[in-house]
Structures are given as C-alpha cells and as structure tokens.
C-alpha cells in the first residue's frame, strides 16, 4: 500500500437503482414518476433567458423558498432548499448528528442513512422492524444522539400514523428528529405542522417523486428557524450556489401548479391499488404500501429469479440482496399501460 493511501477516507458507497443504457425499457426500479412535469414547468424552461447563465444563481434560492413556504403555509425562515432530498438529508446528518451517542434509524430503510453515518463518522444503531415490517416507536425511546426515519418507510412503503410520529418526537425532545417524507404525497398526512410545535423536528420532502422532477434535483426541509439557520450555515460552508437557476425557475412553476400535482398523484395511487389486486391474484404478498411503489414477494418463485427474468424482457424492477428482504422486489408504479405489461410478464413467470 502506498503511504498516501492511509489518508483516504474509505466508505461503502450507496448503490442507486440501475439506469438502463438501452431504449424501449419499462423502468420500474427507481421510484420515478411515470408522468412528466406540468405544462407550467415546460413553459418556465422555455422562458429562461440563456444570457443569465453567465451569472451566479441566487445563493438564498429566494423565489423557490418563498413559493414552497407560501404553498405549505410556512414562513420563509422555516424552509431550507437543497439539491434533491439526498443533499438535504446529507446536510442534516452533517449538521445535527455530531455527538458521541448513537443515532437511531430502522434496520430496513433508505440505505443512504448508514452511508452518510459512516462517511461523517457518526455512531448509529439500527432498530429492527417488527414481524409486519413496521417501525416500533418504543424502540426509539432509548437514549440517543438523534433519530431519523422515512414515513412512509422505504422500501416497505408502510405508513406510520401521525400519532406514532408524534410519540417518537415526544420521547426525543433533547435531540433532532428528522422525518423523511419523500413519499408522503401518495397516501399519508405530513408531519410538517409539527415543526411549529417542536423546535427540534425537521421534515424533509422532495420534488423527485410526486412532482415529476427527479432530473432537476430539488429537495427541501421544514423546521424551526434555528434548525434552518444551522443548515444554511453548513451549506454556505461548502458551496454558496447549490441550486442552479433552471431548477429554481422550474421548481417555482411546479409548486404553483396544484391542480396538476393533485391529478398526477391521484392517477398513481389509483394504479397502485389496481396493481395490488392483480399481484394478489398471481400469488404475491406485500405490505400495504402508501408510496409510489409496492414491496412484493411471491409465495413460491424466488425474487431474484423474477427480477432476472423481468430484466431479460427489458422490465426493470429493484432487487435488494440485503438479508431479510432478499426475497422481495420493489416495484415502482408506472402508467397503466406499463403495469399491464408487467402483470402480463409476471403471469408468465410465476405461472
């Protein structure tokens, strides 16, 4: 080993869902929205003055922060915006989890959590889900250095009711509690209003799922003005200009089109419920997802076999080799046509 190699920070990186390099695939593996952004977003993109590219974007992201704050009934100083919710969450780990006590999060959850904890040298302890794959609030009563969990959880899709979320917060008033709501729009009640009751709570959301803008990388957090200031202080210590002007303008256009947003979410949730019925007929079982995906296992055919056979048909779903969930597939909800093709393929595979 070379001498300088001992100074390299080594981590096990996050592995994203496969991005197919071929055309004509049915892509149901990364929980993207099957429908494009609203017409308002297209118009905003066309209206962008190319001459503005020579200028730095607004470091405070003022227009987008105000639009998000107005939409959700928050003050501007209660909103933080970042380059996708991954950026926001990473900043949260770096900003708020700096003690010697272990940060708590579920053992089956968004796998980026352990990556960030390892990267930033944060001690952590994973809490097991129960036999029904549910988060157990009582497991988060113990002494800790912070708490984070998704709601709905990923990859299970299970939603925790707001009373249970509040219960976890009530037992953790001395640390920062982060509720990751990437999928909340598909069937849950947001915990966002709790930031007005608890000054230690952050609620993180994204434009990537319900607003069809994964490619523009827009995430945001709600919290007390003290928490938001702390996040901005850390952000400006890395990069003053995290959001590009295109994302800012298109984000404003998206958040202001409530009608399209609601129609799009309604279409996806209707397709999800129909897909659940069809999967059940084929012998699949799954938690009752309230997200834009279904986490399914088959009674007799191994998940990896199904995954590989679907891939041969250019249908991409997500397979996890992680113990405990290595016989499950996470299936993103696509268009009705895409899901019909998936069901047809599955009927041939599982027979």
Regions found by a protein language model. Name each.
Residues 1-55, 143:
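N-terminal "arm"/small-domain region of PLP-dependent enzymes with the aminotransferase-like
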Residues 62-102, 300:
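Phosphate-binding glycine-rich loop
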Residues 95-116:
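Conserved PLP-anchoring active-site segment centered on the Schiff-base-forming lysine
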Residues 125, 130-185:
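Active-site phosphate-binding strand-loop segment of PLP-dependent enzymes
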Residues 163, 309-318, 322-351:
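PLP-dependent enzyme catalytic core of the Aspartate aminotransferase-like
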Residues 200-280, 284-287:
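PLP-dependent aminotransferase class I/II
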Residues 268, 281-313:
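Conserved PLP-binding catalytic core of the aspartate aminotransferase-like
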